[in-house]
Amino acid sequence: MLVFIDDGSTNIKLQWQESDGTIKQHISPNSFKREWAVSFGDKKVFNYTLNGEQYSFDPISPDAVVTTNIAWQYSDVNVVAVHHALLTSGLPVSEVDIVCTLPLTEYYDRNNQPNTENIERKKANFRKKITLNGGDTFTIKDVKVMPESIPAGYEVLQELDELDSLLIIDLGGTTLDISQVMGKLSGISKIYGDSSLGVSLVTSAVKDALSLARTKGSSYLADDIIIHRKDNNYLKQRINDENKISIVTEAMNEALRKLEQRVLNTLNEFSGYTHVMVIGGGAELICDAVKKHTQIRDERFFKTNNSQYDLVNGMYLIGN
């Protein structure tokens, strides 16, 4: 079984093909604490051990391990998150080959060539032995690595002339990856990566504001509040101190403005593109501003309804 994995810092996205040809996708959030969860009743608990450390999935714990940093790519918790995604995907536990990702700043060196040291480091990370208390884990046999951003434009690029180019803007939890790719995937004109700019800029601001509203929680909770930021009933349900909701929304909106402006400033480094595509978990937050800033007409601007799956779908189309 070959499984394509976009192992982003906020969520793990999987895509694979069943034996009957059906294409399946699965998403699993990254929210793990360094201790085992308490078992109760029939509810399945995922308690892992890796390198002598205990981990468990916990979507609400404020003590969840921070994954929005570049070190995440080679960390133990990355391995835990990928195995957890596999175990919750519905796939039978077995041996699998995987294709995973690295941000552009990690996949390429300063000369825009594949960074073999980082790529091998990423592969080696998945050779670590992990155990599941009371259960079996997948055995990862072969590991291949693709760069982020670029594969997401595969379908669009096949339809473009070789003199056209697609600007692919991939805003994730930790990084902003931008690539300018020639039509038919005939070449890559320019790449850019910022490992310090991602949706985590907003997540951190929301978490800090939530603490003031007596709602200390995980990054997963903060991200869910960002997603439902326009739903007042949801905010009242999630935020303990109703009188402090405005503090949370003001902090969130200010962080969103900063994120948007930093992305737009980066886009000024690119020129000559004919089409634009916005992908990643942060696509919804910036797509309108990007479209206005680039002044690309409607039929040349691409933003799917499932932006989080764009990268893993492109990986699947290229590698399957």
Swiss-Prot record:
An example Gene Ontology biological process: plasmid partitioning
Record's signal peptide: none
Gene name tied to this protein: parM
Name the UniProt record assigns to this protein: Plasmid segregation protein ParM
Subunit-level organization: Homopolymerizes into double helical protofilaments with a longitudinal repeat similar to filamentous actin.
Role description: Involved in the control of plasmid partition. Required for the accurate segregation of the plasmid.
Domain of life: Bacteria
Pfam family, one: ParM_N
One function term, GO molecular function aspect: identical protein binding
Keyword Transmembrane helix included in the entry's annotation: no
Keyword set, alphabetical order: Plasmid, Plasmid partition
Family indicated by similarity: Belongs to the plasmid partition ParM family.
InterPro entries on file: ASKHA_NBD_ParM_R1-like (IPR056367), ATPase_NBD (IPR043129), ParM/StbA_N (IPR009440), ParM_C (IPR048345)
Organism of origin: Escherichia coli
Keyword Coiled coil set for record: no
